[in-house]
Amino acid sequence: KNIKPRPTKMTIAGKGKKMKFPTLLQPMLATLVDKPFDEEGWLYEVKWDGYRTIALLNSKSTDLLSRNNKSFNEKFYPVYDALKDLKINAVLDGEIIVADEEGLSNFGKLQNWRSEADGELKFYVFDILWLDGYSLMDVTLMERREILISTLPTHPIIHISQTFSTTGTEFFDAAKKMKLEGIMAKKADSLYIPGSRSKEWLKIKAAKRHEVVIGGYTQNEGSPKHFSALLAGVYEKNKLVYTGKIGTGFSEQMQKEMMKKFKPLITKTNPFIFEPDVNKPSRFRPQPPRATVTWLKPKLI
């Protein structure tokens, strides 16, 4: 194999502009469109079904940040450890996923990921924004990708998200056949504008995400809330498969209104094909929440 030489300070300086290491950076977002298209000058990638992540790496620190600048360092520690081992000074943009048995990204498994026993984490990197003291955000996507490919070493957890030279419609049809979430179309000469929703980056969804069904709720010991989390599932071959807990985003008023709807649906029967382990300890919560479960007839979506 031909191994590309790592970019030197001189080659980066010729493309990027000098900039201090950024401690915070909002990702550039894509615009959702309905249909694939065929136009020259676009690069096509897989749309990963995971958590968008900015990785800030230098000799002193490693940080994994969500779209909302929440730290993923503890939550996704295998990715954090892998990036630390790379020993590069760079800012990367990508998506953390859990790969299922077929190698596809599984968002439900990612939401419930606590340790390696819950699935294999991968970090698919699709952009490089800063390297060795230089910002690459004013460099074209095509050039940024060349720098990324020659910067990132091969690693079992860290992967470069491939681009495909084909038409948008062909790639979209292939994505549907492979049961992928969708595709990304990015202008080859697009620059990186942090925090913006760009029309030079487009996302086209192939799989309409399943509507989840509520099969119960939990109440953690000592919690003043009406409920601590909802237990959600999706139907697969007419059986309700548990996909995870939804525990955030409910105001007290919303919880009150939901409890009124839950009341007539309360049942003693677990509606899921397997009983969810609601007290499973995690790395950040080694002590189980001591949650009690109330099952619901699976009528609410």
Name each model-derived stretch.
Residues 1-301:
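Catalytic cores of nucleic-acid ligases and guanylyltransferases
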